[in-house]
Amino acid sequence: MPIIKLIASIILLPLISAQFVFAQVTSSVIGKGWANNSVNTIIFRKNSLVSYKGYQYAAYYSEGKKVVLAKRKSGSQEWLTRETDFKGKTEDAHNVISIMVDGEGYLHLAWDHHNNPLHYSRSVEPGSLEMISPTSMIGRNEKELSYPEFYRLPDGNLLFFYRDGGSGRGDLIINKYDTKSKTWARLQDKLISGERKRNAYWQAFVDSKGTIHISWVWRESPDVSSNHDMCYARSDDGGYTWVKSNGEKYSLPITATTAEHALNIPQKSELINQTSMGTDKKGNAFIVSYWRDQNQTVPQYHLIYNLGKGWDSFALDLRKTPFSLSGGGTKRIPISRPQVMIKGAGKKASVLMIFRDEERGGKASALLIPKLGKRKWEITDLTEENLGSWEPSFDTELWREKQILNLFIQRTEQADGEGITDIQPQEVKVLEFKPEF
């Protein structure tokens, strides 16, 4: 039977930096969750947290591998939690939980996917944590899913991105949910095709105008070191037609031959897959990732962007420690993949990047570029504790609507190559602050 309980806990952390101020950082505890690998704290959870009309929702795996759903009034210290009967193979860190709330207030849930059949449900009514029995979306291409991601459009309808097929041979598929009919339909059978030779690892973003931006690296095999290049596309009509940054229309599916290259990055550059992107107020695309430049030994974070006159990039030379991404499975990596948020526009845009680095004690950290054109930055730590293998995920809708940043926080420990570690369940928290920059 489902378990429902109320939890209240809040910690106040003062945090002050020279250029940007987080006057009060609050950390609210939801409960304890599975921590034996990074499945609860992988960056490609879209979403781990989501807000809608004054309420916030969260999801994570319990120690018993069950999906736990949580809800609170925005800013409240009290969480209502519900342990569902849905279980996941938590030993595989790919099998993340993703949630989103549609424009009618229904909660949508996808969980436990790594080259296996669709696991999807939605709430029985708006605002509820009680879910219907698992169901299909459209009944096609639902047997070998990975990387489920929800995105809410300005009209309240949803998009559902996923990979159909295994690593090195998968295609990107998009479904669309209509809130009026409460049904899913296929939007793109193969937006990006690896032609059974490779696959795209993407990150996507829906801007304030509803334009869908997507960027991706190609991978030639299950070996992470075969990642290469950074490509880009966008849709101005809800995902039906796609264009390059110069407005040139794509013939679909997009392939390695036809894709626009934002940046050429060779294989064996320690280029990571599945990071994040965003846009400035004018809809200009920004992408963050990390890789090792040629003739360098240390992978560094990089910012890639296009202000309307072509692609540009620069390295954030923060790091001193080399590492390698060679091999398959989920790696134990000394840094997290980064999340990015942008304020302002053009060369005056401010860029905020959230990340974790063992060189900084494994804390959640924030890097601010106050003015893009100056290419200078500063870093502030957001937590005091070492978060192990944590990667940042956040409430995209709360940030979009109110510029309040809520991060999903949990200490997790990932073994290299898809193993699990010996660690007790760890607290699942939401760290909330409003960056002033």
Write out the residue ranges for each language-model feature.
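Positively charged n-region of N-terminal signal peptides that target proteins for export
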Residues: 1-7
